[in-house]
């Protein structure tokens, strides 16, 4: 049914177009096409000139109009053919014959310029291309070839300037567009190398140069946002990410980064909206679910956090952070069975996760499983020796509520005490081990 409606609309549009053609004179159609051509709308102008010829196949000015379109497209053969047809339609018109002769001069200039460029005589080539451009400003190949010449001289910004001029003349110039994209990509790769070296200033400058070349290079906006975020300028990071998304609304990584930046600005509502868009575009994007869970956890909305975390480990059963965050939530809720289950998965999938080993040790201690707690705590201390939390949980596991190793417990608590964040708690536990009678009911 839908296809039938679309087909009917197309047929209706064709009849309307035919009606317009037959309701207008060739002069009217020609004048309208000229207006389109001056506005840079080449396809519409071409349709108008062809419509004038359908109305009157002997209407010579329309052939000249098609020649003007052909020269804008860089097609000299088609240009000559259209002028010949104009002459055939109006043999007495000297203007058409003069225009045909002028094309010979353009051919000569272009051939000379290309030959000079092949021979390495760039200055002579530029002279030929400049004269061609001055005499035939609507012919894009002269400035395009000047761009190629500047590329050879490694004057990339001058090259791009000429490629853009070629595209202003002919917005459909695929070679000019490809050349612009190629220059932008080279600058982008250079920027990436600076970024990897940690030279953020040079990287930022190069990414901005990418955008001078090609304002549609959304990855450059994104990388600028990454750098701005890294140096703590979240507001400008947000602006850069939003520019990237204006160019490519399907760029889900951009929405993810935007969500993180907005979260850093305490715009939780905006952050969740951006992250939700990321998973709407890419339902398997586990990291976006994980980032949403961070926000819900921080705002103590544990049920929503569980929902998005369940989604994260559904789309990626090997997503360690999903289990780690789930373990954090169940720890807060003191559901030790669920906490240990999820934290075991987290540490199995990521055996470098210090905090999950620490939390797992704490959960085992709460369950009274001292041997498993010791194993998890030791792993935490091996990964991060100066973190007092791991030593603290090891001390609790060693003491095992008075049933364990007093010396081992004291040694662990002493090491926990070296971490200022854990000093008071460690000193309290040391006193409990040394003076248990003080803490008897």
Provide a role label for each language-model segment:
Residues 40-47, 73-85, 109, 119-127, ...:
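Structural signature of tandem alpha-helical TPR/SEL1-like repeats
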Residues 55, 89, 135, 169, ...:
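Structural marker of alpha-solenoid helical repeat scaffolds
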Residues 23-61, 72-77, 81-84, 88-119, ...:
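N-terminal leader/linker segments that initiate helical-solenoid repeat arrays
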Residues 30, 37, 71, 117, ...:
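Position-specific recognition of the canonical hydrophobic site in helix A of tetratricopeptide repeat
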Residues 31, 65, 99, 111, ...:
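Canonical tetratricopeptide repeat
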Residues 111-115, 186-193, 197, 396-441:
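Terminal, low-structured helical/coil segments at or just beyond the last alpha-helical repeat
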Residues 26-27, 60-61, 94, 106, ...:
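Helix-start (N-cap) detector for alpha-helical repeat units in TPR-like alpha-solenoids
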């Amino acid at each position: 049914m839908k296809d039938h409606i679309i087909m009917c609309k197309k047929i209706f549009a064709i009849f309307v177009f035919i009606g317009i053609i037959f309701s207008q004179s060739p002069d009217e159609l020609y004048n309208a096409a000229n207006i389109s051509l001056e506005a840079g709308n080449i396809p519409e102008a071409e349709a108008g000139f062809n419509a004038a010829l359908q109305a009157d196949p002997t209407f010579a000015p329309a052939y000249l109009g098609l020649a003007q379109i052909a020269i804008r497209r860089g097609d000299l053969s088609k240009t000559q053919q259209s002028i010949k047809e104009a002459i055939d339609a109006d043999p007495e018109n000297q203007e058409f014959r003069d225009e045909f002769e002028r094309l010979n001069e353009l051919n000569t200039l272009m051939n000379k310029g290309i030959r000079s460029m092949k021979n390495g005589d760039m200055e002579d080539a530029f002279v030929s291309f400049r004269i061609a451009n001055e005499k035939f400003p609507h012919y894009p190949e002269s400035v395009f070839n000047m761009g190629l010449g500047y590329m050879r001289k490694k004057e990339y910004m001058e090259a791009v300037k000429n490629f853009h001029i070629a595209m202003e003349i002919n917005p459909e110039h695929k070679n000019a567009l490809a050349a612009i994209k190629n220059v932008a990509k080279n600058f982008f790769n250079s920027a990436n190398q600076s970024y990897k070296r940690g030279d953020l200033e040079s990287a930022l400058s190069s990414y901005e140069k990418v955008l001078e070349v090609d304002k549609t290079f959304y990855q450059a906006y994104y990388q600028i946002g990454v750098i701005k975020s890294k140096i703590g300028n979240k507001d400008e990071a947000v602006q850069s990410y939003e520019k990237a998304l204006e160019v490519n609304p399907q760029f889900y990584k951009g929405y993810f980064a935007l969500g993180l930046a907005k979260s850093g600005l305490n715009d939780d509502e905006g952050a969740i909206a951006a992250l939700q868009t990321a998973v709407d575009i890419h339902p398997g994007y586990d990291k976006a679910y994980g980032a949403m869970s961070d926000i819900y956890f921080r705002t103590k909305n544990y049920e929503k956090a569980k929902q998005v975390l369940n989604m994260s480990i559904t789309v990626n059963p090997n997503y360690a952070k999903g289990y780690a965050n789930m373990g954090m939530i169940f720890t807060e809720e003191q559901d030790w069975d669920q906490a240990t289950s999820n934290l075991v998965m987290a540490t199995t999938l990521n055996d470098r996760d210090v905090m999950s080993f620490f939390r797992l040790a704490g959960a085992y201690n709460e369950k009274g499983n001292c041997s498993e707690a010791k194993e998890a705590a030791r792993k935490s201390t091996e990964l991060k020796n100066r973190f007092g939390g791991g030593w603290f949980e090891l001390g609790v596991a060693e003491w095992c509520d008075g049933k364990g190793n007093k010396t081992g417990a004291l040694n662990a608590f002493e090491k926990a005490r070296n971490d200022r964040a854990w000093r008071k708690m460690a000193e309290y536990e040391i006193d409990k081990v040394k003076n248990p009678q003080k803490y008897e009911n």
